[in-house]
A protein has these predicted regions:
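Short, charged recognition helix plus adjacent turn
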Residues: 68-88, 92, 148-175
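Residues in the helix-turn-helix
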Residues: 25, 36, 46, 62-65, ...
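DNA major-groove recognition helix of helix-turn-helix/homeodomain DNA-binding modules
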Residues: 50-65, 131-146
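Short alpha-helical DNA-recognition segment
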Residues: 20-39, 101-119
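A short, Lys/Arg-rich alpha-helix, primarily the initiator
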Residues: 1-18, 75-99
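Alpha-helical residues within the helix-turn-helix
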Residues: 17, 28, 57, 98, ...
């Protein structure tokens, strides 16, 4: 997996090929062009959260898997939502921020975004970007599927374990 793509692009292509879909079939199902699917897989265009959720539903995998938050999908307790509710997503983001006792400014700094974006996310005025969602999950050890409503309860992850696994994988690749 050594190229310019990130884990998101690698996984959306891997799952598509594994279940036997062509880029054209995915494009038709999602109502988009085949070239957009290709551009996602090549890492030329960032996939929006709305489209990522549609892909997760189509592929029947958790968003956490596509984002690289988890590596195993067996027995993962997610359910798919049919309609994204920006206010509910915002409330979950606010909950994560409050649990960590952070102001919107500090929260924004930790995930490398603007405070105004956090404010808009929390009040349901703006859909969270896929990059910000992934950063929240990695920084605070929370589930993307929980944030978007696919899980009723958050599955808290130990960030240190994730880092150790990453270190082990790198050592294996380098040896």
């Amino acid at each position: 997996m050594e190229n310019n793509t990130t884990i998101i692009e690698e996984r959306i292509k891997f799952i598509r090929e594994r279940i036997g879909y062509t880029q054209m079939e995915v494009a038709k199902t999602l109502g988009i062009s085949r070239s957009l699917v290709s551009n996602w897989e090549l890492g030329f265009v960032n996939i929006s959260l709305k489209q990522l959720i549609k892909l997760a539903y189509l592929y029947q995998v958790p968003i956490d898997y596509l984002l690289g938050i988890i590596d195993e999908i067996d027995n993962y307790p997610y359910q798919f939502i049919s309609n994204m509710d920006l206010k509910s997503i915002g409330l979950r983001i606010k909950e994560i921020r409050k649990i960590n006792r952070l102001t919107q400014d500090k929260f924004a700094q930790k995930i490398d975004t603007k405070r105004s974006s956090i404010s808009y996310y929390e009040i349901g005025k703006m859909m969270i970007s896929t990059a910000d969602l992934k950063q929240i999950c990695e920084t605070f050890g929370v589930s993307a599927d929980y944030i978007v409503g696919n899980l009723k309860e958050n599955i808290k992850r130990d960030k240190k374990i994730k880092l150790k696994i990453k270190d082990i994988k790198e050592k294996i690749v380098n040896n």
